[in-house]
Structures are given as C-alpha cells and as structure tokens.
C-alpha cells in the first residue's frame, strides 16, 4: 500500500493568465454621495500628515472646556494633551508639539474664569506664524441642540468669505485655518466622505465660525454646532514668539470694557446725588410766584376792582406810547441806508473828476 501511494504522481497546477489591471479605471458620469466607497480607495496612501495638538492652560471655565471638547470631536487629526501649568511659558508649547509629532497647535487660555483666548500656531520648526484670538459668544453643541447631525470623523468643506481674499492679514489667517481645521485625506481616524462644512465669515471686524450639515447635493444645510466668534488680537512672526506682524487697532480688552461699564455705573450714582443736592438748594420757599393781577382778588368791591383795572390799562397804554413802533424803526433804517449809498456815489464822482483834471 505504501508503494502505491509513493508511485502516484502529483497533478500539475493549472496556469492562470495574468491580466494587467487598469490603475485608473474610468469613473461614471454621475455619482451619488450615498454610494459606498470601495475598499481599494481606503487603502490609498496617507500623504498629508497634519497633526494638531489641542489642549488648554489651567484656568478655563466649564463652557470653554466643553467648546474644546466639541472642536476635538470635529477634528479627528488632533492629538490630546493634559493642561499646561501656569508657571510655564508659551515657548514650551513648541517642545510639546515636537514630542507629540504635531506641526500645528491650538491652545485655549483662560483669564479670570471669564475670558477665553485661543492661539493657533504653525509649530513645525518654530517658524510660525501664530495668531491670538479672543473667543466671544460661545455656544456648544449640547447647549444649542440643533437639528443638524454629521458623522464623527468625516471630512469637512471649508468655506471662506470673499473678504479673506482682499485683506492681507485675512489671507494669512485663511491659510492658517485651512492647514489647522481641514482633515487630511485618507487619515486613519477619518471617514472617507464629506458631509458637513465649516464657514468662516468676516463681519463687524470679527471672524464668525459655524458648522453646517450638508443635507442634499443642491446646497441644503442644517446647523450642527458649535458656534463662536473669533476677535483677532495679534499675529506674530514666530510660533508663540517673534515680532508682531499685525495688531488689531480696534481691539479693546474685556477687562477694559468692564472697567468702562463700572465707571458709567459709578457716574450714574454720583449724578443722582448731585441732582438731589441741587434740588434741595434750588427748591422755592413759596409754592407759587405772585400773579400780575393779585390785587383784583384782595377786595370783593366791584367798584374798586374796576378802578384797579382802569389803572392797569392806562399804565400799559403809557408804556406802549413810549416804545417806538417797528414800522417807524424800519423807516429810519431805510433812510440811513439810502443816505449812506448817496454819500458813496458822491465820493466816487469826486474821485473821477480829479483824475480827469490831472490828465
């Protein structure tokens, strides 16, 4: 039995024809956004390896922390980091990014548990630039409860206002936003399709950020959140350091605004006290001043009242006679003006006669 099995020859495997694959197959004329992406497209190379370090310094409020959490959910290419101590300077952020292999940084810095500042910087080689913003009108996703919804990790479209192509400092900020907020293509943590859009609108010398879900291919949108306003403060040449390239001339710090409001409230109290003192000083002793015809009501005799009225009428008539009427005054003024014109004409005639005699 063993010999029989040993003598059996192995069958030769059938040879398969090698057909060259077309690397760039023709695409259909129309594709729907709901179509499933084939697996081959998912295995393409991840070239743009942008990584953003998103973290905060100690001293931010709960709402600021929730905003930072929302931004992290919208940016799958972010890297987390624990809170930075207050004793450390901003130049340490470049070293932290180098340790985490990040080339962009987004730092949230709180002041007095009220004000929130955001830094966006290009930390690759500490070349910069970096921009500082004051964050205003913060509304998180949980607070808004909008009807829009987008898949976690999907790539967004970035929409910019037309003014971002006109002003030079906005051109720089646009490029910084594009490199920070946009999710790299074929990122391992990203979904291979686009279903929401980030809008950056320049209005009232501030940048308004909104996040919308793309409902349909014809442009239907529904807001998702979060929403906040970035008031640009300064743009620096380096990463968290360097010369100031641009500074906002219209920027007023929140502490200065609160100081002005407190001063206005204090002035309101001082004005009220001054008005009270002035009212007490100028308050009349008598309830009313005397009338012109008080004498009429002192006596009930009608004869005496008639005499008083006749005396008052006579007195008014005498005063009116003393005053010159307006018509007489205007007549005198016209006569004086005519006399002055005649004098001027006579002088000019005399001058012309003298000149003729000399000639």
Curated annotation (Swiss-Prot):
Region feature (Disordered): 1-42
Keyword line: Nucleus, Ribosome biogenesis
SMART domains, per the entry: Brix
Main localization (coarse): nucleus
UniProt subcellular location: Nucleus, Nucleolus
Molecular functions (GO terms): RNA binding; rRNA binding
Biased composition (Basic residues): 1-12
GO biological process: ribosomal large subunit assembly; rRNA processing
Chain ranges of the Brix domain: 50-241
Protein name: Ribosome biogenesis protein BRX1 homolog
Lineage of the species this protein comes from: Eukaryota, Metazoa, Ecdysozoa, Arthropoda, Hexapoda
């Amino acid at each position: 039995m063993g010999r029989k099995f040993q003598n059996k020859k192995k069958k030769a495997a059938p040879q398969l024809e090698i057909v060259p694959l077309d690397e760039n197959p023709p695409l259909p004329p129309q594709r729907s956004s709901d179509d499933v992406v084939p697996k081959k497209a998912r295995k393409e190379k991840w070239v743009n390896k942008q990584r953003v370090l998103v973290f905060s310094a100690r001293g931010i409020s709960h709402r600021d922390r929730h905003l930072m959490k929302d931004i992290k959910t919208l940016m799958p290419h972010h890297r987390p980091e624990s809170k930075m101590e207050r004793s450390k300077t901003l130049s340490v952020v470049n070293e932290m990014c180098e340790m985490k292999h990040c080339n962009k940084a987004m730092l949230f810095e709180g002041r007095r548990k009220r004000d929130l500042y955001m830094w966006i910087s290009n930390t690759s080689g500490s070349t910069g630039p970096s921009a500082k913003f004051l964050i205003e009108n913060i509304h998180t996703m949980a607070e808004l409860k909008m009807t829009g919804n987008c898949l976690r990790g999907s790539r967004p479209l970035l929409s910019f206002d037309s003014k971002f192509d006109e002003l030079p400092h906005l051109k720089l900020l646009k490029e910084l936003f594009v490199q920070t907020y946009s999710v790299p293509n074929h990122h391992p943590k990203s979904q291979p399709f686009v279903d929401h859009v980030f809008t950056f609108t320049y209005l009232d010398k501030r940048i308004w950020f909104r996040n919308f879900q793309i409902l349909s291919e014809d442009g239907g949108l529904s807001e998702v959140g979060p929403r906040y306003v970035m008031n640009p403060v300064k743009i620096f040449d380096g990463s968290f350091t360097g010369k100031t390239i641009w500074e906002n001339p219209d920027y007023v710090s929140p502490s200065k605004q609160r100081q002005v409001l407190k001063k206005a409230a204090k002035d309101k109290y001082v004005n009220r006290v001054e008005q009270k003192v002035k009212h007490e000083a100028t308050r009349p002793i008598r309830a009313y001043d005397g009338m012109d015809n008080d004498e009429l009501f002192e006596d009930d005799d009608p004869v005496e009242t008639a005499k008083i009225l006749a005396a008052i009428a006579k007195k008014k008539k005498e005063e009116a006679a003393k005053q010159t009427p307006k018509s007489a005054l205007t007549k005198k003024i016209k006569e004086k003006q005519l006399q002055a014109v005649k004098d001027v004409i006579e002088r000019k005639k005399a001058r012309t006669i003298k000149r003729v005699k000399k000639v």
